[in-house]
Each structure stands twice: as structure tokens, then as C-alpha cells.
Amino acid sequence: EFPPAPNPFHYINDYTNTLSTEHKQILENKLIAYSKETSSQIAVVLVPTTGEYEIADYTFALGDKWGIGRKNLNNGVLMLIAKDDRKVFIATGQGLEGVLPDAFLSQVIRSAILPQFKQGQYAQGINDGLNQIIAASKGEFDAAQVEEDVFDKYIPFLMVLAFIAIV
């Protein structure tokens, strides 16, 4: 039903063999750069079908199962393309809902993604959709927030070490 999480993690996961190796790499590089710059994660998954699941339910369940986004920031985005079902859905973590509301994402699907898909241009449709999502969400989080969060976890430990060193 659900594909297993890729190990190592990939941002572009095509279980339909729709995208060329070159297109996958170009899109992967774009999403790696976005994640490094913002700490947010966008994953794209192409599956043949969602089976008996509604596409929204499938997308949210897959996003939870794979753990897309930083857990403490809940800043993941999952673009799911069910190719044989001819459906697209974009799910966001709560941390990005303010800048990526459902109405905006529906507009991205209708205006950027689907017109390209109808012409058989899947890589271009995904790229166009990602460009709009990235532009809208770029300022929401930055990589420094993740570094601060990691540092905050070690402050009590560092305080104990400093105390021991003084004594």
C-alpha cells in the first residue's frame, strides 16, 4: 500500500518510472538546496495509485510514515502524484500552513502542475509547482533555527560540564 521510506532519504521518489534520471537529479538538487537553506523539507512522490484511499488521506499518512520535515518544526511538504488515478495532492505540516494554505496549494496544482501534466510534461509540472511552493515558503524557517534547536538541547549538559570544570 505505502512505499517504504527511502534509505538513504531522497526528495524525489518515482515509483512509476515517469521521470528521467536527469530530471530526478535536477529536482533532487533543487530540494536539497532548499532544505539546506530553510531547514524545511519538500518531498515528491509519484505512485501509480492510492488504491482505496482518498488522495489527501494517503498523502498525509505517507508524510507521517516517512517523517518529512523537522519534527520540532513540523515543516514538511509532500507533493503526491497518483499517476494512474490522475490526481495530485500537496500536504503541509502545521509549521508551514500559514504560508502554504490549502487554497494556495490548490491554485498551484491547477495553474502550474496540471497544465504541464496534461501535455505529458511531468518533470516540468513538478518543477513549476515546486518553484511556487519554494517562493511562498522560503522565509518561514531557516537553517539557523535547526542549529539553535540542537544547541538548546545540549545547554543543560554543557552547564553541568562547566560546573564540574569549575569545581
Segments and roles (model prediction):
Residues E1-A162:
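Folded, non-transmembrane soluble domains that reside on the lumenal/extracytoplasmic side of membranes
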Residues F163-V167:
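Alpha-helical transmembrane segments
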